[in-house]
Amino acid sequence: MFKNNRFETKLAQNRNFRLHLRKNFSNQAMKKYIATLALVFASFFAFSQASCCFVKKDGMQLLASNKTFIKSHALPKPYHHVSKAGGVMVEFKTPDDQMAKGFYIPADKPSEYTLFVFQEWWGLNDHIKREAEHFYSTLGNVNVLAIDMYDGKVATTREDAAKYMGGANPARLEAIIKGAIAYVGPKAKIATVGWCFGGSLSLKASILAGKQAAACVMYYGMPVKEVEQLKLLQTDVLGLFAGKEQFINPTVVKEFEANMKTAGKGIQTKIFDAQHAFANPSNPAYDKAATEEAWNMAINYFKNRLK
């Protein structure tokens, strides 16, 4: 048979080159490739919580256009918070390729529990930071993260508060909460609490937390109404509501209780003889008696579950 020595030599060189590439890729590039792939999958799973209740603006956000609701909120008094517990502002990634912030107080000793604190409609102001620190000092060895749901905006007027709450993008709200869940890690057990707009966010965050959810307290926030969404809850709920308000009124509370029962979830509620925002940290005219009773209920509830 006819032989082409030059061809065979070239072929052998190509084989050796391919073997060199394989060896080089296996020993060097493969390690980088695997590491990169691991990071991609880690990022994917970190933000892979099921979508919950942020497809569209809910009843709470729609209240931002109600003049009576707007006037029901007393303007917060000026207050500057200086943390005595080592609280600091932190940043974390969100699944929409942005960053979010929060006021974070780490536990004195390593703890699997983290309490998410959700702002009123004013934003993450210093009153909320003070309340976050109050929970921290009362509950003991629990991490606390007060999440900034307005991306740095803080209202000092009713008009701005209404604009921020009503104009918040539901998809962005969900992304911020998912980012916070990823920030505390997959092994964290998450409790939630919030007032007004934050009360609604507290319930939604517990749904998004899935199996990581450990406890949920909501102060007079508009409840999730879809039973299929409530079925995703992996914790019971303590709801603290105002009997004298016309918005999230006793009828809304009864509907919430019925929906939770249909969903097969535990719920405890208390309707106080008070107006909306009676316990808001930023409310200078808060109802002292109702606030103290609600606080004690919330603390006892958390202590029974975060242990």
Language-model segments: what does each one mean?
Residues 212-222:
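A conserved short beta-strand
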Residues 239-241:
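Short beta-strand/loop motif that positions the catalytic acidic residue
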Residues 51-84, 88-184:
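Serine-hydrolase catalytic machinery in alpha/beta-hydrolase-like enzymes
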Residues 185-195:
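Alpha/beta-hydrolase fold nucleophile elbow
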Residues 131, 249-259:
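Short alpha-helix in the alpha/beta-hydrolase fold that links the catalytic acid
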Residues 244-248:
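Acidic catalytic loop of the alpha/beta-hydrolase fold
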Residues 263-307:
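C-terminal catalytic histidine-bearing segment of alpha/beta-hydrolase fold enzymes
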Residues 194-198, 202:
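Gly/Ala-rich beta-loop-alpha elbow adjacent to hydrolase catalytic centers
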